[in-house]
Design a protein with these regions (language model features):
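Phosphate/NTP-binding elements of NTP-utilizing enzymes
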Residues: 1-168
């Protein structure tokens, strides 16, 4: 669902950012690799010029770079100019990572950010969602989808999981 959408958004935005940079950021670099690396390679295959698993970077045919990063090491994201950014599981990140490091990296190119994740109570991700939901700021938009909206999941499997899993 949301990770596959994020991969498509990264590829499309990178293709529109001639020689530019786009980031996918997860709570840790290991999570970024586990969640996104193979999906990007699969979906982007026709437009990938090269990939480097050691530094988790994919170079596209137009010279743009997709980098996978971990929010637990924010110093690795300083000093870059970004056209697009995905923050996955934003509720599990410190808000300063976006506010102090990544938001400024988007400014000079008027870049966009996509925040995705699983709700984790009322925290900075919740506040951002509520802000976007108000529609007072045209630069923010909120969407809410459940597992039932995911065409890749069988609804009966979701029902079985709901019955067998505890809620916390």
């Amino acid at each position: 669902g949301k990770s596959r959408l994020a991969a498509w958004m990264l590829i499309v935005n990178a293709l529109q950012a001639d020689r530019g940079h786009v980031f996918y950021v997860a709570p840790t670099q290991g999570q970024a690799r586990d969640i996104m690396w193979s999906t990007l390679l699969e979906l982007g295959h026709p437009v990938i010029a090269g990939s480097h698993i050691n530094n988790l970077q994919i170079k596209l045919v137009n010279g743009a770079t997709i980098s996978l990063k971990g929010a637990d090491r924010p110093e690795t994201m300083r000093g870059v100019s970004l056209k697009f950014l995905v923050l996955d599981e934003y509720a599990d990140m410190k808000p300063d990572v976006f506010e102090q490091i990544l938001r400024p990296a988007l400014a000079d190119q008027k870049g966009c950010a996509m925040f995705i994740g699983t709700p984790m109570g009322r925290n900075h991700f919740y506040e951002l969602y509520k802000y976007a939901e108000l529609d007072d700021d045209p630069t923010y938009k909120a969407w809410h989808f459940t597992s039932y909206d995911n065409p890749l999941l069988d609804p009966s499997e979701i029902d079985i999981a709901k019955r067998s899993m505890s809620s916390y």
